[in-house]
Amino acid sequence: MKRTPSTDSNSTSISNTRRTFLAATGLSALAAASKALAREYGPGAEPVRYPDPDIVVLDKRFEKYKIGNTPIQRLHTGMLWAEGPAWNGVGRYLVWSDIPNDAQLRWLEEDGHVSTMRRPAGNSNGNTFDWQGRQISCEHGNRRVVRYEHAGDVTVLADSFQGKPLNAPNDAVVHPEDGSIWFTDPGYGILLNYEGNKADLQLKEAVYRIDAKTGKLTKLTDEIFKPNGICFSPDYKRLYVADTGASHYADAPRNIKVWDIVEGTKLGKGREFASMTLDGFEKAGFADGIRADTDGNVWASAGWVGDGYDGVHIFAPDGERIGQIRLPEICSNVCFGGRKRNRLFMTGSQSLYAVYVEARGAHVS
């Protein structure tokens, strides 16, 4: 005799109850996951359980750089778009830009005090220091690269090329052997009045070099859509530049490029160093500011994708992604600082973050 399934009201009720329970369980799991992602960093936040789950090892080569008993810390918040962190080893402070607010801020290592260091600041973006301890800044608003002298006056290092104004210098590094300044000019600062003064680009986006002795400005390459973050390898034989051209060019890659440095002043042919595509995400984000450590790894700010992606991506010298530092905001730039240059400072949209790592910055920041 064939048995037919029961269709009485009790069975239906049990089935509905089970479905309701499973649905509720699923929602609870999603809520828990969302809560886990929505990490609190404010003064009243509970301390994170070690090891910090947002310092992620993707490859065993990153294990030695992750410290088990240190947290990612938010040092300050309240900016509109934080950028350009740079460490001053003599003054023991970090300077960074808040571009839309036209200000440079300073964080003191001794007590964590934050103050406005310079305002107006030319809508400055990237900052660094030369080997004489003088601050170099890339100004969106004035479309130039400047140096702040010890006496307080400002020296304009570059504001035009071949008779045309620069677009909006973005980030810069200083070469130790000859003091030359290498910088990127993607033009983001003139696209809107929000971060500078709106205007048309008169030059192709490019990477430049300023000769420290003569002041001569040389174009190194324009074989890149929108050159952004920039850094040298530890031996100064290679130059890395982040390409964020996909923000405005449909056929632009989302990657970091590398060039061999020829005769100390020129670049060979560029090639892809690392892709910003990450397994498990439908789209790739952007690398922005980048810095190298003494082992040749490249630490790249990353963002514009969302939770689990935004933060810092760490690439080994062969271009393989080996680790992540996840942040609750888009990360715009990074630098190494602190007494041992083993503290990674990260500007994350509206906030400043820091974390100790078992790596040391390769250069003056």
Report residues per predicted region.
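N-terminal secretory signal peptides and thylakoid transit peptides that target proteins
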Residues: 4-28
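Blade/loop signatures of beta-propeller domains
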Residues: 40-70, 364
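Blade-edge beta-strand/turn elements of extracellular beta-propeller
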Residues: 65-77, 113-120, 151-163, 210-226, ...
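Beta-rich, blade/repeat-based domains predominating
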Residues: 77-92, 120-139, 144, 162-181, ...
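Short, solvent-exposed loop/turn segments at conserved positions within beta-propeller repeat blades
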Residues: 100, 141, 191-203, 248-254, ...
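Short loop/turn segments immediately following beta-strands, especially the blade-tip
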Residues: 259-265, 357-362
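Blade-level signature of beta-propeller repeat domains, shared across WD40, Kelch, NHL, RCC1
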Residues: 337-365
